[in-house]
Amino acid sequence: MFNHDWKYSINSKTFADLNIELFRNHKFKTVLNYIIGVVGWNGLKLALFVSDIYTCIKLLAFNSWSNNIIKPYLPFKISKWLFSGCILASIVLLIWEAIAGMRIYKTGNISLTYVNNFSRNLNSVLNYSKFCVYNMIERKGFRQKMTFFTFFQLKDCIRLIFTDTPRQVINGLTLWSVLVTVNKNEDLGDLESFTGLINKIKNIGQTNHEEAVILSLMLFSFIIWALFVFKFLLAVICSIFVYYKIINDQEYSGLREYICVTVSENVDELVERQRKKENDDTIYKTGLLESQTFDDFKEVENKIETSFNDTSYASNNDSMIELIERRPEYKSQDVCGPIPTMKKTETMESFVDNGNPQYTTRFSAILDSPYINSYESNDIKKAKIQSRSVNTPKYEDLSSSDIFNKIHSAGQLKSTTSMEFHGPLDSMPNTTNNIRNFNSNSSRPRPPPLQTKSSINSKADSNDNGRIYTPMKAYFREPDLPRKGLLEDEDRTYNYT
């Protein structure tokens, strides 16, 4: 039981490896254990230690008791050296435990400080969070609880047997002779009845208050000692089953090794649970938020790509008329029901928008006609837009170099901010077939002339004459591309006006 020659492994986890503030709690059971088991019990031990020192000084220096009212049952010479020897032995044991406990306390090791009573009590008194850590080292199952109880009771049995028991026996005999027996200091077998015991206590309290207080303190200390003796005897009985189980398992060489290994495993589990909690908090605060953000970005990118593919824009070689025919039709829907679609004159900027914010470009918001927010088609008024004519051939018309040279020499390219088709789209029959027929026939009719605004300066006209107008470059949805060609003059003109 008290063999320390075997080797056992001690967990190296210290309080520095833990964030002890995470274990701090103010549950009712935890606070109650701290008040009773730490503050109250250690305060009582300190008071008893001071009382023992005072009694020892009175016995050895003044050769008298601390009180002259109640005399001990044994003769003074025997009681004097018996009390003095027990008090001195308890002081020596306390100093030894303090030295060993301070060495363990400085290590900060959780397992070692938990096993040592002095270091555990010192950590608990100085830091409530460390007490919460000790309190969370769980003892799983009835076997572990019984083994821990047996170990700690047998560990403190030296002080109980050799320093406290002799003194409490003398106190018990004194209390027995004064309170329980009929006549003081006579036959101890002649006991007082329960009614006579109550009446005796009342009589002592009425005649001498100091004697009643001293008897009460002696009775209180004797009851505490009796409880410790009962726990010690219970631990001795439990040790039979505990050692039988340990020897039968053949895993541990003794009770101390089993306790140290079990505490080490519990500390490992406690540290792992604390690290998992910290990782979960970190993931919740940073990692999970970032992953959701990236998922949102991916979802937005997929939606943009899907909407762009559904639009099915043609290549750069397609004509503007084909783009108009391929334009997706949009009908707005609101909580009040479907909104009638505006019938607007199809211009170069209006066919891009047509009242649909999904297909709005950066220049259609500037050049398009204002939209009147109303659900009555009769109240809708369209702003007047000054139309300008530009003799601009389509991209397919420039396949012949002769036509391009004639147009360039004649200076027919004009700057424009809008281009109007004077006929509705429905009146254009089979535009694609006409374009295909134009490739075979050289005499294709030219598009209707467009009028230009007179506010365009001559410098813009001269610069635009040397360019070939390509409509598709104006409808790219990439905002980082430079705006070149006719759109530069359009922006300058709009800002100027």
Curated annotation (Swiss-Prot):
Residues 429-444 have a biased composition (Low complexity). Present with 538 molecules/cell in log phase SD medium. This is Low affinity K(+) transporter 1. It comes from the Eukaryota. Residues 1-29, 102-216 are extracellular. One of its GO terms (cellular component) is fungal-type vacuole. The modification Phosphoserine is found at residues 291, 319. One of its GO terms (biological process) is potassium ion transmembrane transport. Keywords: Cell membrane, Ion transport, Membrane, Phosphoprotein, Transmembrane, Transmembrane helix, Transport, Vacuole. Residues 51-80, 238-497 are cytoplasmic. Disruption phenotype: Leads to high-affinity Ca(2+) influx system (HACS) deficiency. Causes a large increase of cell death in response to mating pheromone, when PRM6/KCH2 is also deleted. Belongs to the KCH1 low affinity K(+) transporter family. It catalyses: K(+)(in) = K(+)(out). Low affinity potassium transporter that, with PRM6/KCH2, participates in high-affinity Ca(2+) influx system (HACS) activation during the response to mating pheromone. Directly promotes K(+) influx and HACS may electrochemically respond to this K(+) influx. KCH1 and KCH2 act at the apex of the calcium signaling pathway that is used for survival during prolonged exposures to mating pheromones. Residues 420-469 are annotated as: Disordered. The chain crosses the membrane at residues 30-50, 81-101, 217-237. GO terms for molecular function: potassium ion transmembrane transporter activity. It is found in: Vacuole membrane; Cell membrane. It is a multi-pass membrane protein. Residues 451-465 have a biased composition (Polar residues). Induction: Expression is strongly induced during the response to alpha-factor.
